[in-house]
A protein has these predicted regions:
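Long, low-complexity, intrinsically disordered segments
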Residues: 504-510
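Membrane-embedded helix-loop-helix hairpins and adjacent transmembrane boundary segments
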Residues: 1-462, 485
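Membrane-helix interfacial anchor on the cytosolic side
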Residues: 456-480
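Solvent-exposed, non-transmembrane helices and loops of integral membrane proteins
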Residues: 480-504
């Protein structure tokens, strides 16, 4: 359980899961492709401040990671240690009864004793396997919250619930605004030839946000989860797997085209939605249909096992009655790779001339007057000197103040010195002489509790003070800000509509 080198028998959360996570982080620009947070990505006053916000975001995760580890460890101890056997049994019985009431009310017993609840669960398993799968998943996913509700005292439980409500509200409001903005800015406006007036744009933005809220409510009301929550995140996030190809290749490859971008988005979405449907309908619909045709089932079994064979045990596909042979992370990876392939192939087929990247990114002759001039990073890297090369690799430029540089170097030292350094040391050490189990216990206690608590305490005080200061500054700037009506998100002739006067000025001076 604790030794990460002993994961060959794991089907879902193995080394391939980690590999896909690393690949997705690079491919997606460390979260830039997750459109649920695009409001944060686009809210900075300029590109430099956006870069600094991402640097600060690395320190923000210390306390969160520690809380996840602590609550999980507490729940595991409570449900497995002999000293809490009676209390844990009562918690499990109550949880199963609540899950039955949620998934299959007809099977929920009137008497919530252990024997009655267990018997009802067994009847559900025998009579409705598909619904039992949802029941079993919810029971597993709700174990930690159920344990916390039983062991926390009244006041502390109330504070914890209040914190969860605050987090849910901030997340849902951000997501509704982000997805509503995407519907208006990236779908409605490009298809509409006549631009919106500011009043129309705000009206339709509010309508879109309302539609997103209604959809989220209906989806949550009718959807039954059948897989781990992290796998659910992976497969639903894969709906926008094509966004990585659009952003990364669109910014760094001048032959990318709009047709290639649409194909990448459509291919990624189709694979994700198709995989999501297969995962949820496999037990109740898909597999029974396959079982009715033994020849088709045999062919699918042979084909699937032949494809995954070279990659076993990290990718292990087996056609079984209980679940779809691909998990959410594998579907996510397939969607990303397919989106990249679709973008490249279609762009090469439809590209007539290279796109002017300098014009779009304000480089060279297209640099704006309010932007600091600095040689590109690859030009800086050609200069001699270790510090110059390191500066180019880290992305530190003339926009960085002394405080910004201190923050950036602190993240570099933390990520490469502590994070990558300890990782590499532990890997080499264990390849030569594997650690005993107790050493892993000590290591995770130091890294996940001690170090994380220090980072969490420092960052909490730091962000509370700095966040309050920046919030007041933002309100002051908003009071003085005068909106540019042309800067409404439209793209004309390959650039933002707000940049057209600047381009016209350059053309007149040429």
């Amino acid at each position: 359980m604790l030794n990460p080198f002993d994961t060959s028998a794991l089907r879902d959360f193995n080394l391939f899961y980690v590999f896909v996570g690393i690949f997705a982080s690079i491919y997606g620009g460390a979260g830039l492709t997750w459109l649920g947070t695009q409001g944060y990505n686009a809210a900075a006053i300029n590109a430099h401040e956006q870069k600094m916000s991402r640097i600060l975001g690395i320190w923000r995760g210390g306390f969160l990671g520690m809380m996840i580890i602590l609550t999980s460890a507490v729940a595991y101890t409570y449900t497995h240690h002999g000293n809490f056997a009676a209390e844990a049994a009562e918690t499990r019985t109550h949880l199963k009864a609540e899950a039955l009431m949620d998934v299959a009310p007809a099977y929920a017993p009137e008497q919530r004793d252990t024997a009655a609840v267990e018997g009802a669960a067994e009847r559900l398993k025998a009579e409705d396997p598909a619904r039992f799968q949802t029941f079993e998943t919810i029971e597993k996913q709700m174990l930690v919250p159920s344990v916390l509700s039983d062991i926390l005292p009244v006041g502390l439980l109330g504070l914890f619930c209040a914190l969860m409500v605050f987090l849910m509200t901030s997340t849902d409001s951000s997501y509704m605004h982000s997805w509503g903005s995407i519907l208006v800015q990236d779908i409605a406006m490009p298809l509409r030839k006549k631009p919106f007036t500011p009043q129309q744009q705000l009206f339709w933005l509010r309508v879109a946000i309302g539609c997103v809220a209604v959809y989220a409510f209906l989806f949550s009301f009718f959807f039954g989860q059948v897989t781990y929550i992290l796998m659910f995140f992976a497969i639903t996030g894969a709906i926008w797997a094509g966004a990585g190809a659009v952003i990364v290749l669109g910014l760094y490859w001048p032959r990318g085209t709009a047709a290639g971008a649409w194909v990448a988005l459509i291919v990624g979405a189709l694979i994700a939605v198709g995989g999501f449907a297969l995962t949820n309908a496999w037990l109740g619909v898909i597999y029974p249909l396959l079982a009715a045709s033994p020849a088709l089932l045999g062919w699918l079994t042979t084909t699937v096992e032949a494809i995954s064979g070279p990659f076993e045990p990290y990718i292990l596909w087996r056609v079984t009655p209980d679940k779809f042979f691909m998990n959410g992370q594998e579907l996510n990876f397939l969607a990303m790779i397919s989106a990249i392939g679709g973008y490249v192939v279609v762009s090469l087929l439809t590209c007539r001339e290279k796109f002017n990247m300098d014009r779009m990114l304000h480089r060279g002759a297209y640099r704006r007057d309010d932007e600091k001039l600095e040689p590109p990073l690859y030009v800086q890297a050609q200069k001699k000197g270790f510090l110059v090369i390191l500066k180019a690799l880290t992305g530190i430029d003339n926009n960085f103040t002394r405080g910004d540089k201190i923050l950036s170097w602190s993240v570099i030292v933390w990520s490469f010195g502590w994070g990558f350094g300890t990782f590499l040391t532990i890997v080499i050490w264990n390849l030569i002489s594997p650690w005993p189990q107790q050493w892993w216990v000590n290591w995770f206690f130091i890294s996940s509790i001690v170090v994380a608590s220090i980072v969490g305490l420092v960052s909490t005080v730091w962000f509370s003070i700095g966040g309050t200061r920046d919030l007041l500054t933002m309100f002051q700037r908003l009071r003085k800000h005068r909106a540019d009506v042309a800067d409404d998100g439209r793209v004309q002739d390959g650039v933002s509509a707000a940049d057209l006067p600047h381009d016209q000025k350059l053309s007149d001076n040429a």
